[in-house]
């Protein structure tokens, strides 16, 4: 099934896409536990993030060499095409992350979690605007169930942060508005990535390379005035690192490549389903390895996630005009 502008509508998932989705769910779900066990507290965050981006670029280039797309890259690649397909989404994601950091300081975990999950709706909205991919009534219902499940999971795992000392104006301008803007930007960036891969036929591996380079450059510029930059100058780039630190760094890099593949083949909306499902995986792994039982929120969210995935998969939008023809 294709939309009017030539983009493929991911109404059904093939074996390859299902495999990518399962891998991403497991990786995203296991990442918090792996990071907690393998990264020491004195490791400078910027050093792990930059190393992750470098590993991501190396892995993507290896995969491109393996599938033969690296050979024709010199002839096909253009700066304008790269900036349009990858530069813009990378810049949007960087701004989104900054807005989330601002808002989290001014909102309690419940309000933050609820507002942050609206990105699923905005992804569906921008997918319709940019790619003309419509959702059926039941799919919209499935998105509502998914957001409910995401909020329950986020609240169950969230901290008991109290923002009672923050006045209403500060909460609005430094909390609510930034997180809503971040949700809009998240939906826009995800849809742009899907557009670049499905309409412009931009390789997901190439997008990973380009976005990692742009993101790394933005991060390097930010270190000029950030505490992490001062810490790197004082203690060195690999301060606090051990051999185990590479495990979560490599895992996170592979997860970034999987995000690109899932977005490219299944779409940004389905990526949202994968990310929420991964929260359940995290809860189960915490129970298995740390003895921490799933919260009541998690137990309530489990059937909601399963129902939403089933509904979204079984009842795609069908164009009545095309059906008659």
Swiss-Prot record:
Keyword set, alphabetical order: Endoplasmic reticulum, Membrane, Sugar transport, Transmembrane, Transmembrane helix, Transport
InterPro entries in alphabetical order: Nuc_sug_transpt
GO function terms (MF aspect): sialic acid transmembrane transporter activity; UDP-N-acetylgalactosamine transmembrane transporter activity
GO CC annotation: endoplasmic reticulum; endoplasmic reticulum membrane; Golgi membrane
Primary site of residence: endoplasmic reticulum
Subcellular location, record wording: Endoplasmic reticulum membrane
Signal peptide, first to last residue: none
Superkingdom in the source lineage: Eukaryota
Pfam families documented for this protein: Nuc_sug_transp (PF04142)
Tissue occurrence: Expressed in roots, cotyledons, leaves, stems, flowers and siliques.
One annotated GO biological process: UDP-N-acetylgalactosamine transmembrane transport
Annotated TM spans: 14-34, 43-63, 110-130, 136-156, 172-192, 204-224, 242-262, 271-291
Lumenal side: 35-42, 131-135, 193-203, 263-270
Side Cytoplasmic, residues: 1-13, 64-109, 157-171, 225-241, 292-325
Membrane topology annotation: Multi-pass membrane protein
Family as reported in the entry's similarity comment: Belongs to the nucleotide-sugar transporter family. CMP-Sialate:CMP antiporter (TC 2.A.7.12) subfamily.
Function: Mediates the transport of UDP-linked acetylated hexosamines across the endoplasmic reticulum (ER) membrane. Facilitates UDP-N-acetylglucosamine (UDP-GlcNAc) and UDP-N-acetylgalactosamine (UDP-GalNAc) transport. Regulates the cytokinin signal in meristematic cells through modulating activity of cytokinin oxidases/dehydrogenases. Part of the ER quality control system, which determines the fate of aberrant proteins in the secretory pathway.
Protein name: UDP-N-acetylglucosamine transporter ROCK1
Gene this chain is encoded by: ROCK1
């Amino acid at each position: 099934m294709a939309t009017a502008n030539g983009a493929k509508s991911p109404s059904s998932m093939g074996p390859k896409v299902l495999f990518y989705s399962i891998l991403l769910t497991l990786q995203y779900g296991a990442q918090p536990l792996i990071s907690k066990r393998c990264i020491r507290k004195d490791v400078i965050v910027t050093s792990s993030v930059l190393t992750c981006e470098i590993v991501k670029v190396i892995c993507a280039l290896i995969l491109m060499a393996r599938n033969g797309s690296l050979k024709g890259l010199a002839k096909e690649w253009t700066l304008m095409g790269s900036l349009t397909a990858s530069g813009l989404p990378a810049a949007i994601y960087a701004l989104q992350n900054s807005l989330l950091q601002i808002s989290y300081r001014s909102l309690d975990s419940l309000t933050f979690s609820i507002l942050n999950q609206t990105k699923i709706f905005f992804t569906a909205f921008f997918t319709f605007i940019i790619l003309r991919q419509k959702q059926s009534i039941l799919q919209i219902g499935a998105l509502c169930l998914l957001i409910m499940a995401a909020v329950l999971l986020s609240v169950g795992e969230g901290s008991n942060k109290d923002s009672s000392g923050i006045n209403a104006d500060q909460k609005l301008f430094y909390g609510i508005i930034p997180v809503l803007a971040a949700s809009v930007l998240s939906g826009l960036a995800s849809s742009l990535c899907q557009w670049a891969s499905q309409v412009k036929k931009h390789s997901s591996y190439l997008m990973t390379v380009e976005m990692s380079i742009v993101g790394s450059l933005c991060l390097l510029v930010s270190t000029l005035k950030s505490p992490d930059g001062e810490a790197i100058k004082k203690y060195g780039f690999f301060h606090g690192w051990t051999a185990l630190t590479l495990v979560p760094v490599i895992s996170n890099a592979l997860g970034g490549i999987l995000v690109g593949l899932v977005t490219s083949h299944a779409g940004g909306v389905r990526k949202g389903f994968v990310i929420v499902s991964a929260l359940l995986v995290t809860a189960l792994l915490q129970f298995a390895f740390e003895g921490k039982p799933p919260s009541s929120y998690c137990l309530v969210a489990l059937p909601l996630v399963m129902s939403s995935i089933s509904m979204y998969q079984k009842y795609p939008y069908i164009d009545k005009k095309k059906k008659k023809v």
